[in-house]
Amino acid sequence: MLRRIVLIATASAAALAAAVPAAGASSLPLPLALLSAPAEDELTVTVSDTARTDGMYELRCGPTGGDHPAAQDACDRLDELALEGKDPFAPVRQDQMCTEQMGGDETARITGTWQGRPVDATFSRTNGCEISRWHTMEPVLPNTRS
């Protein structure tokens, strides 16, 4: 009887030892060579009704490039806002109280990819909150102050 218990225990231990590496092998992470590199940040900035800086500009960050007139400064500003924990493309909250003032007819739209996520943001200068939001995005958006 003792011999039978020892044989069963030995067989069970051997079966368990053989099964554990097989189960663990399927959960191993992928080799680093198979992981993709982070995507370059690519934005299209379209500006209208500014009287002097209307147009469509391409802005690439990481590395800096495109035809944006202040590409390096714009990328630095976006990085600065991200380090502060701010979403530079977030709209003004609907429940936000804003001063009733008109900052001008200028409008802008930014589309593309930033930090791996899609961007589709519009900017205007139709009230105090939107004016502040525009200024926060300078030099990504042009300086409209004289």
Question: What is the meaning of each model-derived region?
Answer:
Residues 14, 48, 99-101:
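Residues embedded in well-ordered secondary-structure elements
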Residues 13, 81-82, 141-144:
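Alpha-helix boundary/capping residues
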Residues 95, 99-144:
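Extracytosolic low-complexity repeat regions of secreted or lipid-anchored proteins
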Residues 26-73, 79:
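Extracytoplasmic low-complexity, Pro/Thr/Ser/Ala/Gly-rich segments
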Residues 65-108:
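Mature extracytoplasmic domains of secretory-pathway proteins
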Residues 17, 35-39, 51-53, 67, ...:
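A generic structural signal for short, solvent-exposed coil/turn residues
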Residues 1-26:
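Secretory targeting and sorting signals
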